[in-house]
């Protein structure tokens, strides 16, 4: 089972709001998911993001692949740097 960390669209027409979900890669965009690990609101001035960093790091450690947009969000929040440092520090 290939697992992805990706965005699920919520909100209403012309006012999107996204949840950052862990889902099987074969599931549809707004379909079944395993766990919600954050939210992303692109409409506010500073693009409000909330993340469960410990859960995201655990999923990344287990091999989950983030989508391109989620990868950019995690990079801006510094989560990927923490993952890289924990993976390669010895």
From Swiss-Prot:
SUPFAM superfamilies: Ribosomal protein S16
GO biological process: translation
One matching Pfam family: Ribosomal_S16
Gene3D superfamilies (alphabetical): 3.30.1320.10
GO cellular component, one term: small ribosomal subunit
GO function term, MF aspect, one: structural constituent of ribosome
The keyword Ribosomal protein belongs to this UniProt entry's keyword annotation: yes
Keywords noted in UniProt: Ribonucleoprotein, Ribosomal protein
InterPro entries per UniProt: Ribosomal_bS16, Ribosomal_bS16_dom_sf
Superkingdom of origin organism: Bacteria
Family recorded in the similarity comment: Belongs to the bacterial ribosomal protein bS16 family.
Protein name per Swiss-Prot or TrEMBL: Small ribosomal subunit protein bS16
Source species of the chain: Streptococcus sanguinis (strain SK36)
Underlying gene: rpsP
């Amino acid at each position: 089972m290939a697992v992805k960390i990706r965005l699920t669209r919520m909100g209403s027409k012309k006012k999107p709001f996204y949840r950052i979900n862990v889902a099987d890669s074969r599931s549809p965009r707004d379909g079944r998911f395993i766990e919600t690990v954050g939210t992303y609101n692109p409409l506010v001035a500073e693009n409000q993001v909330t993340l469960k960093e410990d859960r995201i790091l655990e999923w990344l450690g287990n091999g989950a692949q983030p989508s391109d947009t989620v990868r950019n969000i995690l990079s801006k929040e510094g989560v990927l740097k923490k993952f890289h440092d924990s993976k390669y520090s010895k």
